[in-house]
Design a protein with these regions (language model features):
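Conserved anion/nucleotide-ligand pocket segment
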Residues: 65-151
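Short acidic, glycine/serine/threonine-rich loops at helix termini
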Residues: 29, 56-59, 76-79
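N-terminal small/polar loop signature for handling phosphorylated ligands or for N-terminal nucleophile
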Residues: 1-40
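Short, acidic/small-residue loops that bind anionic groups at enzyme active sites
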Residues: 32-57, 63-71
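Short, well-ordered alpha-helical microsegments
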Residues: 25, 53-54, 154
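Oxyanion-binding "anion nests"
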Residues: 145-172
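Structural motif
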Residues: 17, 45, 171-172
């Protein structure tokens, strides 16, 4: 928690991008100073287990970005996928009041083990054939996005960072 608080207080740091997940992050909650986060807004990006951090940002009134981590995308062997690279550029470096999330033309479920035998080995990419699949409802939606890794939610329920019912109302 002290590292996170120092990063928020440090005026020379403009973004905090998670290296990878952090399934024990919920344990630092008693030591988080939400006023420090609120009064020192920064770009915060990560995904999966960093859902706890995103809920911290939400409680402090900050927008956070559920997106790539250093090890899993920025540090991708050979290159970061174009879709991810373009999304990061568009979301973080262009002034825009809103944006549309378009379907990627390619995807991967491949995992390349980080070891010396795989230097210069890229994930195998697959061509997307269908675009988005709507699982519930229909058409285009808009609104505030509130979510994260569903496996992490049970760790947050009942804590001070869990959004109340009104905050979930109308959320995507």
């Amino acid at each position: 928690a002290s590292d996170l608080m120092r990063a928020f207080e440090d005026k020379s740091i403009s973004a905090i991008i998670c290296a990878i997940g952090g399934d024990d992050t919920v344990r630092i909650l008693p030591y988080v100073n939400f006023d420090i986060i609120k009064n020192n807004p920064k770009i915060f990006m990560g995904y999966s287990d960093t859902t706890i951090n995103h809920l911290m940002m939400y409680k402090a009134g900050l927008v956070s970005y559920y997106g790539p981590s250093v090890m899993c995308e920025f540090g991708e062997y050979v290159r970061m996928p174009d879709y991810t690279k373009n999304a990061v550029k568009n979301i973080l470096f262009k002034n825009s009041a809103g944006f549309s999330v378009k379907s990627s033309s390619e995807w991967s479920d491949d995992y390349v083990v980080w070891d010396e035998n795989n230097i210069n080995v890229s994930k195998k990419m697959r061509r997307e054939k269908h675009g988005y699949e709507i699982l519930q409802g229909f058409g285009t939606v808009s609104g505030h996005l509130l979510g994260g890794c569903i496996d992490v939610f049970p760790m947050a329920i009942g804590t001070e960072i869990w959004p109340d019912l009104e905050q979930w109302r109308g959320a995507i």
